[in-house]
UniProtKB/Swiss-Prot annotation:
Cofactor(s) of this protein: Co(2+); Zn(2+); NAD(+)
Gene Ontology BP annotations: amino acid biosynthetic process; aromatic amino acid family biosynthetic process; chorismate biosynthetic process
Matches recorded under Pfam families: DHQ_synthase, DHQS_C
UniProt record similarity statement: Belongs to the sugar phosphate cyclases superfamily. Dehydroquinate synthase family.
GO CC terms: cytoplasm
Matches recorded under SUPFAM superfamilies: Dehydroquinate synthase-like (SSF56796)
Name of the molecule in the record: 3-dehydroquinate synthase
Gene name per UniProt: aroB
Source organism phylogeny: Bacteria, Bacillati, Bacillota, Bacilli, Bacillales
């Protein structure tokens, strides 16, 4: 098991990563001044609960903690105000106090929702991220927590850093292929925005999703977390370079909102968004990434590589203008100058509409 420290401008917290990391949770809690008898409130979903909730709850109860749990539906649609309110109600019914700790046991949806509950319950209590998906290697680090709104993804939220991240990689063994693929999109994103050598390693070593196991999977998680942590250390509140982590997310979030949360996985939407960002980058900077055959590469893993035929460019543009990076209704996208080098660029509506239409006609800019 690997232990390291995540640093931000306002906080440091431990990351435990590896097979069996969950077993260190009681020791970790004691080190965080959470003695036996502290109330722990586990938020998980109905996909993870049958697999791991009893195991984690029993381990904590054996360490003499007062353990409660609340189960939400699985899927992106669960990041709703109704589920947020229900979690708050359950926390109040369990009489959580300001010394209590919320544990987010699940993927990115659970982590985002549970973190936002923690950020706002009694004006903020502590929480621990326990990711069970590959996607959550990105969302569990950095302290961005939120719920969705029909008009936009992650629009209601906060910056609230966890007390710790406990990433037991044995949890990934039960991950469905589609969810593994979804998480791998964020791995690819980290390589493209910050690390050309990692990108080249991915191209050479992860030919298919079947290669994403064992040491290769752990390496992907470590590299992704290292890249994310270095950016968060430099820009915790997303005033500058942290926006680079939104590569592929401007169109990706628009697709998720327009199609209905859960129609595409987050990673599937981001994959299409990254291909579009490359497509726009080629036209804006006047150079070609054709030799990289990005669409062909993405398709090899089973990602969708073109816009769904049911979406309209003008509707997507309106969603993109509601993105958190936008200023005064002007879309700002993270674009690729070269592998490992990105920048945020303002784009005019008419150009974006034309490029969306062209991208759709070309089937993902192949």
């Amino acid at each position: 098991m690997m232990e390291r420290t995540i640093e931000t401008a306002t906080k440091q917290y431990p990351l435990l990563l590896g097979d069996g990391a969950a077993r260190a949770l009681p020791r970790l809690l004691r080190s965080l001044a959470c003695p036996p008898g502290t109330k722990l409130f586990i938020i998980t979903d109905d996909a993870v609960a049958p697999l791991y909730l009893d195991e984690v709850r029993a381990m904590l109860a054996a360490a003499e903690y007062d353990v409660y749990a609340y189960i939400i539906p699985s899927g992106e649609a669960a990041k709703s105000f109704d589920n947020y309110y229900a979690c708050q109600t359950a926390a109040l019914q369990c009489s959580l106090d300001r010394r209590s700790v919320i544990i987010a046991l699940g993927g990115g949806v659970v982590g985002d929702l549970a973190g936002f509950v923690a950020a706002t319950y009694m004006r903020g209590i502590r929480y621990i991220q326990m990711p069970t998906t590959l996607l959550a290697h990105d969302s569990a680090v950095g302290g961005k927590v939120a719920i969705n709104h029909p008009l936009g993804k992650n629009m209601i939220g906060a910056f609230h850093q966890p007390e710790a991240v406990v990433y037991d990689t044995t949890f990934l063994r039960t991950l469905p292929e589609r969810e593994l693929r979804s998480g791998f999109a964020e791995v690819i994103k980290h390589a493209l925005i910050r690390d050309r050598r990692f990108y080249e390693w991915l191209r050479a070593e992860v030919k298919t999703l079947a290669d994403l196991r064992g040491e290769a999977l752990t390496y992907c998680i470590e590299k992704g977390i290292d890249i994310k942590a270095s950016i968060v250390r430099e820009d915790e509140k997303e005033t500058s370079v942290r926006a680079h982590l939104n590569f592929g997310h401007t169109l990706g979030h628009a697709l998720e909102s327009e199609l209905g949360y859960g129609t595409l996985t987050h990673g599937e939407a981001v994959a299409i968004g990254m291909l579009f960002a490359v497509f726009v980058s080629e036209r804006l900077y006047g150079h070609s990434f054709a030799e990289h055959r990005f669409a062909e590469w993405f398709a090899r893993y089973g990602f969708p590589v073109s816009l769904p035929t049911t979406v309209e460019a003008d509707r997507l543009l309106e969603k993109m203008k509601g993105d958190k990076k936008a200023y005064a209704g002007t879309v700002r996208m993270v674009l690729l100058r070269e592998i490992g080098d990105v920048e945020v660029v303002e784009l005019e509506d008419d150009k974006l509409l034309a490029w969306l239409d062209e991208f759709a006609k070309q089937g993902g800019g192949r």
